[in-house]
Amino acid sequence: MHEHEKRVLEGLLFLSGDEGLSIEQLNGCVEELNKKEIETVLDELMQDYLADVHGIELVRFGGIYKFVSKEAIHPYAQKLFSSTKVATLS
């Protein structure tokens, strides 16, 4: 329903990285949506990313929305980061 808005918010959240963004910050960038509309679109995005086809999900921590890897990815991430450390130390 809100496909354009989803793409915009998704892109902004991706760019924000680990810090994530609040509804207020998103509202400052996407002025054509009010805070309630932004919250609705974020809820839709959260539902979209719950599908098993995605390795990431959209979460909210203390009013901040951000993308994180799903728990099923964590063993692979451990291998990635442990091999990266070994490679940089040698």
Feature names for model-found ranges:
Residues 10-14:
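Hydrophobic residues on short alpha-helical segments
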Residues 15-22, 33:
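Short capping segments at the starts of secondary-structure elements
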Residues 29-30, 48:
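Alpha-helical structural context
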Residues 23-28:
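A short acidic, leucine-rich amphipathic alpha-helix
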Residues 45-90:
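Short basic alpha-helical hairpin corresponding to helix-turn-helix/winged-helix-like nucleic-acid-binding
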Residues 33-44:
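Short amphipathic alpha-helical interaction segments
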Residues 2-7, 87-90:
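Short helix-coil-helix linker/hinge
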Residues 2, 31, 70:
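Conserved phosphate/pyrophosphate-binding and hydrolysis machinery centered on Walker-type P-loop NTPases
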